[in-house]
Amino acid sequence: SAASDVYKRQTDDRIVLPEEINGLPVVSAAPYAFSAHKDGEEDAETWESEDAFSFGEDRLLAGEEVQEIVFPDTLKEIGRYIFYGCKKLERLEFSDTLMQVGTGAFTGCSGLKELVIHQKKGIKSCAKEILGELWQKIDVDFLYENGEASGKRAHMVFPEHYDEAVENTPARILFTEYHGSGTNYRQCFYSKELDFAEYDSLFDMAVVMDKLEVLVDMSFGRLCHPWQLSKKAKKQYEDYIRGNLKDIGEFLVESGSLNGLELLSREKLWNREGLEHSIDVASGKKDMEISAFLMNERSRMQKEEQKVAGETENDGRPVKRRKKFQL
């Protein structure tokens, strides 16, 4: 049977549910379980974590108290409106055992930013059902732990999408204006499996509809974890980065993303203009660590240019041959 109506009382805002509670396997979570709008909460059983730390006040973790939840591998379904009103929920981690998602489960979860899915059985998941309830940008990490993909990771970014009514006053009409390419990206699932090729094929649309920081996350995520990334798609992301290197470099420096700058070096995506601009930005920001990294990259690039120039010069130089004399 399911331990489906158990709540956790502790002082941490991170909830890690066990596989068993009171000897019962945790296979489902009840409707409204973590919602601030639970019905009949006074009848619910309260589970207190053994590793909870008390600071003089226990809190029932629900509603805006919830920031991160880790579901056990045994969980198969979550009930309707389970996270209703959990505005501060940011991260959700679960396995591909979870396949059933109740209606409105993520209503009001405007702060959710990250899903981590442990693919223990195969490549199917409930990601599409969850993403379908969320309009904001969501990062999804698929961690493959079985079969030929075991040990692989895919970091997939699903952009935001929303529409708004815009008034054309002279014509006295309203029309709908759409923002973000997220609607299209959320349709890249078939039979609960993500179609990587279709996902990658939408990037040209994203370039037109989404912001620079989103495009950086998307392209860098695919290059850093290139599971199911074709040569054509890889070149597409690389071409975008090279074509916008000044803006991307500035964004990475301003946001303090040394990992992003290191990826540009590792994938050999720097050009002289983009690197020099990034150095100027880092200098103005007085970020010593990033400045040192970029200066080292400049030195490395100069050495490579000198090496290439030397090889070119040698290739163009006529070869001296010994003259033969007949005595």
What are these regions (language model features)?
Residues G221-Y237, N259-L261:
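Repeat-mediated protein-protein interaction surfaces in helical alpha-solenoids
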Residues V6:
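Active-site loops and adjacent core secondary-structure elements that bind or stabilize anionic groups
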Residues S1, R9-V27, D39-E77, K87-Q100, ...:
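Structural signature of tandem-repeat unit edges
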Residues D280-L327:
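Charge-dense, extended regions
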Residues A33, R59, Y81-I82, A105:
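C-terminal per-repeat helix/turn "cap" of leucine-rich repeat
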Residues R266-V281:
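Short, charge-rich amphipathic alpha-helical segments embedded
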Residues L263-L264, L294:
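Conserved hydrophobic site in ankyrin repeats
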